[in-house]
Amino acid sequence: IGCAGLLMAILPKIISRWFAPNKRGFGMSLCTPGANFAALILGVVAPLVINGLGWNMAYVAFGIYFAFITVFVALTFREGPEEKGLAPYGAPKGTQAAPAPKLEEKAVASGKKVSPLRQVARMGITWHFGLFYAVYQLGYMAATQYYVVSMTGNGFDLATAAFSLTIGGVLTIITELVVGSLSDRFERKNMIGIMVACTGVLSAGYAIYLLNTPAPDLIPCYFFIALISASTGVITVIMSGAGEYYNDECRATGTGMIGTINIVGRYLGPWVAGIVIDATGQTAYAFVIVAVAMIVSCFIAFAMPRAATVQAKWAANN
């Protein structure tokens, strides 16, 4: 499960090679919905496989499936379009420059060795974006862990509560496609800030509703959970936005480091929410934590420098 976090390091680098800067949000929006499609499919397929093979052999079956995908990717995927004689999608014809020299090549020319990790660690945006992503993940994980529990704890059966995730999953796919393309037209950090603020407001609304309604109705619960889930489709913009703060040679290292920093929030979210729920006896307080985390991360996102500014500064210093 933890290996899924590798995408934070890999996808931004691949997308930046295959898509022109003004199409990277669109490119990322084509990739990230795959997880939501898989979740919807597995909701039907996984129980059938487990019932037929047992849970232990089901893991073996899925392992074989993943191995097949690995071989397929190794045989068919390419690092960049130039390997196939192509230009990045969206790049004007005849304007695609030759690949930028690698850091090692620059080092030979300048007489000094350059470490991508050192370059990334010295950039303020790495820690700024890492702080944002850690706080965001704290709220995100607190929400995902308690969507269903917030309904079952208020009298709804498990199947009814779980259906809210299906609705949210479909809306998330749509959101990822829309905001990914919109981020190609507007500053990505602003898109991130706006979407995260929406998550915070919706979470606060859901918490207030649960705390002030002795017997919550089905439709309002579906409404809040589905829209909170949909607003997390901003992950498309987060991944493409993080990658644009680095040049091609440092991009995987930079986004990988940001993805590592966010582990703090991923583990703290469910833990803190669980402690608060045990202390108060009400699941609604999990969404109070979500709201606070999202509003804080919203301000952190808006305070980020523009990607073009960071790139220009990096180029001037190197």
Predicted feature residues:
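Cytoplasmic helix-loop-helix junction between adjacent transmembrane helices
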Residues: 1-34
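Helix-loop-helix hairpin linking two adjacent transmembrane segments in secondary transporters
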Residues: 31-82
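C-terminal membrane-cytosol helix-exit motif in multi-pass small-molecule transporters
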Residues: 64-96, 300-305
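Juxtamembrane intracellular "pre-TM" segments in multi-pass secondary transporters
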Residues: 86-128
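Extracytoplasmic gate region of multi-pass secondary transporters
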Residues: 123-176, 239
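Helix-to-loop junctions at the C-terminal end of transmembrane segments
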Residues: 176-187, 277
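C-terminal transmembrane helical hairpin of 12-TM major facilitator-type secondary transporters
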Residues: 188-241
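A late C-terminal transmembrane helix in Major Facilitator Superfamily
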Residues: 243-282
